[in-house]
From Swiss-Prot:
SUPFAM superfamilies: Arginase/deacetylase (SSF52768). This is Arginase. One of its GO terms (cellular component) is cytosol. Its EC number is 3.5.3.1. Pathway: Nitrogen metabolism; urea cycle; L-ornithine and urea from L-arginine: step 1/1. Its cofactor is Mn(2+).
């Protein structure tokens, strides 16, 4: 989560094979393990992998899980390969697009426009073309969260804007919860990643045993004691798990905090604070960094992640997808880009594979920020990627 505290643009090509970590320490290149056997016709994917080799920080680390099993020993029972996307929890194929134009979990403006741009790019029509009946929910309409943020000076302990975040995420929680209980698949468009406090808790109200795939460059599990920035988009997982509840500001006291460590798995991590690493280890949380994607390949990583949170392969799974999990070559208009990320195809494969299991019950797509684009093409690239994530999760295939 380190770059939640300091946005860097090292991905622009600064430096000769070295990048700076969260605290300024030089991080060197790391050999890739699986790429020689992996053929790609896309030159940009190959270039992204070279950037990954040069720019990804950190050591090999481990895959942390609640039962201490090695990653390679994970079984994938109940998950057949080569299936078509299907949705056993939503045979009627009804979904709710929940608009969450909220930026109060961090300091930059523009991310509140993400949902508007995703819709303008044709996300709704694309999903309807896949056979889904769509309704649009706007739980934040009529509230002046963005205007209030411009005037906000509230800090409780280290937490910035806890009242804004608490109120907005509660409204989002209620909308997602209602959609899930009505038999609709909630697809929430953010907004910054603090909105997941509302989305995940809303889904867990309907599916208390659901597993959560958190696809992100950052772990977002800082507590109010460990966060350096105070930005709550770097803390949603700690709230969802009920960590250090005694320190929570009153506006966030409504959060149930029922997510169990054994029910979350990360994919795509590459910028994690030291305190977050300790939390992951202490709680035994399954976490796959870009090292593991490089070593095992994305297919095996996804299978291991799904097996960790859904051992028998039959339970519900939700996906909370921060677009910065994908390398900024493909997703430049986002608030905390970190080079060395997933290729576009790797990023889409994750949700394609979840769709094939039939277990998807909810999706978040967050952190598209058109205002941070250097030019219009960056906006198009980022927004099109966000739309592709949603379409692939809801059944779009290459063949």
């Amino acid at each position: 989560m380190a770059q939640r505290n300091c946005w860097r643009r090292s991905w622009l090509g600064v430096g000769g094979g070295l990048c700076l970590g969260a605290h300024g320490a030089a991080r060197g290149p790391r050999q890739l393990f699986h790429l020689t056997a992996k053929q790609s016709s896309a030159a940009s994917d190959a270039k992204c992998r070279r950037w990954r080799a040069a720019g990804r920080g950190g050591g090999a680390g481990g895959v942390y899980n609640g039962r201490g099993a090695a990653a390679g020993s994970r079984q994938t029972s109940g998950m057949a390969h080569n299936e078509h996307p299907h949705y056993k929890f939503f045979e009627s194929k009804k979904a709710s697009l929940v608009m969450a134009p909220f930026s109060g979990g961090q300091g930059k403006s523009g991310v509140e426009d993400g949902p508007k741009y995703l819709l303008k790019q044709g996300l709704r029509e694309g999903v309807e073309g896949l056979g889904w009946e769509i309704e649009v929910q706007r739980p934040l309409d009529g509230h002046d969260f963005e205007e209030r943020k411009q005037r906000a000076t509230e800090v409780v302990g280290r937490a910035k804007n806890p009242t804004l975040v608490g109120e907005a995420t509660h409204l989002i929680h209620d909308a997602v919860r209602a959609a899930a209980h009505a038999g609709r698949l909630p697809v929430t468009l953010g907004g910054d990643h603090s909105i997941a406090i509302g989305t995940v808790s809303g889904v867990l109200d309907r599916y208390p045993d659901a597993g959560l795939l958190w696809v992100d460059a950052h772990a977002d599990i800082n507590t109010l004691a460990s966060t350096e920035s105070g930005n709550l988009h770097g803390c949603p997982v700690s709230f969802l798990m009920g960590l250090e509840r005694e320190s929570w500001p009153a506006p966030l006291a409504w959060v149930p905090g029922t997510l169990r460590p054994s029910k979350i798995a990360y994919i795509g991590l590459r910028d994690v604070d030291p305190e977050e690493k300790e939390i992951l280890r202490r709680l035994g949380i399954t976490a796959f960094s870009m090292y593991h994607v490089d070593r095992y390949g994305i297919n095996k990583v996804v299978e291991m992640a799904l097996a960790a949170i859904n051992p028998d392969g039959t339970g519900p799974v939700m996906v909370s997808y921060d677009v910065d999990a994908i390398d900024p070559m493909y997703v430049p208009a986002t608030g905390t880009p970190v080079r060395g990320g997933l290729t576009l195809r790797e990023g889409l494969f994750i949700v394609e594979r979840v769709a094939e299991t039939g277990n998807l019950v909810a999706l978040d797509v967050v952190e598209c920020n058109p205002e941070l684009a250097a030019h219009d093409l960056h906006v198009v690239d980022t927004v099109q990627t966000g739309c592709s994530i949603a379409r692939c999760a809801l059944g779009e295939t290459l063949l």
